[in-house]
Amino acid sequence: MAAKVLKFSHEVLHAMSRGVEVLANAVKVTLGPKGRNVVLDKSFGAPTITKDGVSVAKEIELEDKFENMGAQMVKEVASRTSDDAGDGTTTATVLAQAILVEGIKAVIAGMNPMDLKRGIDKAVTAAVAELKKISKPCKDQKAIAQVGTISANSDKSIGDIIAEAMEKVGKEGVITVEDGSGLENALEVVEGMQFDRGYLSPYFINNQQNMSAELENPFILLVDKKISNIRELIPLLENVAKSGRPLLVIAEDIEGEALATLVVNNIRGVVKVAAVKAPGFGDRRKAMLQDIAVLTGGKVISEEVGLSLEAASLDDLGSAKRVVVTKDDTTIIDGSGDAGDIKNRVEQIRKEIENSSSDYDKEKLQERLAKLAGGVAVIKVGAATEVEMKEKKARVEDALHATRAAVEEGVVPGGGVALIRVLKSLDSVEVENEDQRVGVEIARRAMAYPLSQIVKNTGVQAAVVADKVLNHKDVNYGYNAATGEYGDMIEMGILDPTKVTRTALQNAASIAGLMITTECMVTEAPKKKEESMPGGGDMGGMGGMGGMGGMM
């Protein structure tokens, strides 16, 4: 086992503090509308230019192992805030640095670290409760656009396109971000339920222009097995032919004579038909077939539940207003399922998302939820160069998370004002001793840091602005760092999602509190360089080998 190096007490706090200082100073220059860019060197390709706090934090590794531990702990604050709320990483880092710096001063002055932490925790609990009180719901498109704009570093085009996407696919809809091909951002919306399986034979195409099979008001047959024997299908096909309506067959697979018969019937015009494979694999396929059944008002023909294909009737089939099948995907528009059943299914999937611990499963469940509840929107990000594309795409993704958070928990005045407004709630926090009271004061001073940093990044005197904002009666009154004006932050469109501010404060206090109460650090001792072999001085004796010439 490698040898270890230990540090104790004040040495620990100083080492951690230095590491946090380096990381936080690099991150906090990006805060606010006048925040600066940070250029990150990459081992290959062009450097990345970013104003995203968590991207900067992730790049930082320090040489001194003790300092690095401090930096890594604050990096955890930024990452966790990004995971929980999608934004607010820089605010969280600034808060963590502030709490730690103020906390270390108190510990070195001889106060009890555990009581300081308890005081900080009590202050944060009171502040979060007050945040929820001043929070306003974020419902209309204008407010959503404003939140997106602020999160995308004041890029209005990004805020507007996110608000438009949310309006089109609903709050539950899936919005994905992709590289675009032009210079401008573009929005594509897929109506209805779309899954990535195309037609099994090009002979099903009936629209030569789009190379797609389009079925108006079709029946939809859902089968949870392979169909290769046509005899199973004939009774149902005859009934569908009599009804004069088209048929979409979705099965695990359709092959051999079954597929050939469907193609022949389609070409001859006996029954207009298209066949596709069911989406997904294994259990996920079963779940997705059930989703389609609920959406279209049909049943999944499965031997597991005692339904056979031969005995299936028209009552077992689903239907939709329109179905479009292309080479790569199938879209079911306006399925005729019962609204109550769809709502119940959506609730069931929501519960599964809550109970799931895997990010991958959550993402797949979220996609299923969106297909049932709303639709899918794709934001195509346009840019002139690849470097700009990467930076812009990261901003769009951040803004998307922030707007989702705003819809979830509402909005508070932005620009660091919300944290200033909750300071009054700290006056009524009950403490057990003087050290806890100092803990509350540490949190109070830290909560004013984000506003000061935003103002500092604009080049204005921070203390003057903070004082003016703090002493104003109106909850929404603040400083617009982009224009240099004072006024109502909500009216000026400077909003922060409540969830982002809350998460940043809670995560910063949690990690900074742990750091203040750290008494010992252990790390591996640096390896000593192995001594090189001594210079070959005694090789000189080999000079006598010259006499070997006589051996010839």
Curated annotation (Swiss-Prot):
The keyword Manganese does not apply. Pfam families: Cpn60_TCP1. One of its GO terms (molecular function) is ATP binding. The keyword Nucleotide-binding applies. It is found in: Cytoplasm. Its EC number is 5.6.1.7. It comes from the Bacteria. CDD domains: GroEL. Its main location: cytoplasm. Keywords: ATP-binding, Chaperone, Cytoplasm, Isomerase, Nucleotide-binding, Stress response. ATP binds at residues 30-33, 51, 87-91, 415, 480-482, 496. It catalyses: ATP + H2O + a folded polypeptide = ADP + phosphate + an unfolded polypeptide. GO terms for biological process: chaperone cofactor-dependent protein refolding; protein refolding; response to heat. GO terms for cellular component: GroEL-GroES complex. It is an enzyme of class 5 (isomerase). Forms a cylinder of 14 subunits composed of two heptameric rings stacked back-to-back. Interacts with the co-chaperonin GroES. NCBIfam families: GroEL, PRK00013.1, PRK12849.1, PRK12850.1, PRK12851.1. PANTHER family: 60 KDA HEAT SHOCK PROTEIN, MITOCHONDRIAL. Together with its co-chaperonin GroES, plays an essential role in assisting protein folding. The GroEL-GroES system forms a nano-cage that allows encapsulation of the non-native substrate proteins and provides a physical environment optimized to promote and accelerate protein folding. Belongs to the chaperonin (HSP60) family. This is Chaperonin GroEL.
